[in-house]
Amino acid sequence: MKHSRRQFLTAGTAAALSVPAIKSMAQDGSLASGSDAIVRPPEGKTILLSCKLGMITREADGKKLSLTERLRMAGDAGFDGVDLDQAAEFTPAQARQAVADSGVFVHNAINHAHWSKRLTSANEQEREESITNIEHCMRVSHAAGGNGVLIVIGRGDDGPAEVTEERARQGIKRLIPLAALLGQPILIENVWNKMFYDHDAPPEQSAEAFVDFVDSFNSPWVGMYYDIGNHWKYGQPKEWLHSFGYRCVKLDVKGFSRAKNKFTDIGEGDLPWGDVRKGLSDIGFTGWATAEVGGGGVERLRLVRTQMQRVFGL
């Protein structure tokens, strides 16, 4: 009987984890029962629209908002779900309860400490803290019903390229077993971190180095969270999407102006959205697209959602 790589990883890692470890995850809410009610995203959509939790105001009418209230605000603005980019602030059980109470889907989790506690760091303790932070994100996303964690693996100036990449590779390899057990792909985002591109070189660079790094794991649990706006400065989005292919699991969405060398609202600037749509169609992309721009209350969120619908032709 033949097994897929996904089946092999799931079975192998479940067997490798100890009973106390699994019991601990059940107690903290990160290993939720399949019989529990889980909010599900809308069906029948090719691209699901999301915003970062960090875009949603923390206060309204002088009152601090709970996670449940902030998720509801995203739902009121018409988003299909939310990317929980403040995962460090919540336990898995808290995230799951907020999703259940709000009725709004959470598809992903992020811990922004990945900039200060990096997998590429020369400091071993920082690398260990990075792994712990990512594990927490996996548990939060899984408990909330999500299917992925976005990570920034580090900075290129942490050392020579071959050294920093190997540090990150070893850290991610340690994370794959938990990713497989919880069904949480590790999604590497392209950022201005001087890795897998030449930060000081002109545009029209390729995505080959990024693709090679992801392929080095030979694992279905490592993929890409493609930030469309981030690398418009350095390469053509349609060409990058063609290079990514099936590796591209989720999208971050913002605008960028090459002419003014600055980020913009979605649809502003000179990013070729027609090419983006063509590239996504060519690779058969379906999944989550998450806004990462300035946020606010419901009206601002509705505007952002409308901008996303326009650039994706929805």
Spans of model-derived segments:
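Glycine-rich, proline-tolerant flexible connector loops at the mouths of alpha/beta enzymes
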Residues: 83-100, 159
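Aromatic/hydrophobic pocket-lining residues that form π-stacking "cages" and hydrophobic walls in ligand
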Residues: 70, 95, 137, 175, ...
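Active-site acidic/histidine proton-transfer and metal-coordination neighborhood
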Residues: 11-21, 41, 105, 120-226, ...
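Mid-chain, structured segments of secreted extracytoplasmic proteins
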Residues: 90, 99-124
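Active-site-proximal loop/turn and secondary-structure-junction residues that shape catalytic pockets
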Residues: 55-57, 88, 112-115, 153-157, ...
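Histidine-acidic metal/acid-base catalytic patches
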Residues: 1-78, 145-147, 198, 207-314
